[in-house]
């Protein structure tokens, strides 16, 4: 079974965080590790994270401190700190709720790609604060290809799962 390292950056996300953590724990693909970087939250985010880590097997959840420079710097810091050893890499946001098959579907799609540098992404079911569906994320307006990815967001970051080779390349960048 392929291990997936999930990276999550948090900051004052306590009001939504438990639902995302529960959705990670409920994944049908159970071979995952979670690394969370909290960027100086002043709400209950640290307590929610500590409780989740305490309820999981030892070593499955790692908590680190963010750099204190915003969401993008927090994710970059996570990528640099990740201890990769051949895992696929997935990203999530603190206010996501993953479908139980999210990791399994992504890994199945990656397994069907011959190129070792592979990236999976999906559309997002957009919900309101009560988790009531309000629509799907828009489809890209241009064909999916590298050239268009340079000028258009073709894969939402919070749906990305990348192959081990792609994860290593990202970390080395």
Language model regions located:
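Nucleotide-sugar donor-binding/catalytic module of glycosyltransferases
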Residues: 1-173
């Amino acid at each position: 079974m392929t291990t997936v390292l999930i990276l999550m950056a948090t900051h004052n996300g306590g009001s939504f965080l438990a639902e995302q953590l529960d959705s990670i724990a409920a994944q049908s693909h159970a071979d995952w590790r979670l690394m969370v970087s909290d960027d100086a939250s002043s709400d209950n985010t640290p307590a929610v994270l500590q409780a989740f880590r305490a309820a999981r097997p030892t070593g499955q959840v790692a908590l680190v401190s963010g750099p204190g420079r915003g969401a993008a710097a927090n994710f970059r810091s996570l990528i640099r700190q990740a201890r990769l050893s051949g895992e696929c890499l997935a990203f999530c946001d603190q206010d996501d709720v993953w479908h139980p098959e999210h990791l399994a579907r992504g890994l199945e799609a990656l397994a069907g790609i011959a190129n070792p540098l592979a990236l999976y992404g999906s559309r997002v079911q957009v919900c309101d604060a009560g988790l009531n569906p309000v629509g799907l994320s828009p489809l890209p307006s241009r064909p999916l290809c590298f050239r268009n990815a340079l000028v258009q967001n073709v894969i939402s970051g919070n749906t990305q799962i990348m192959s081990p080779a792609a994860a290593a390349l990202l970390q080395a960048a």
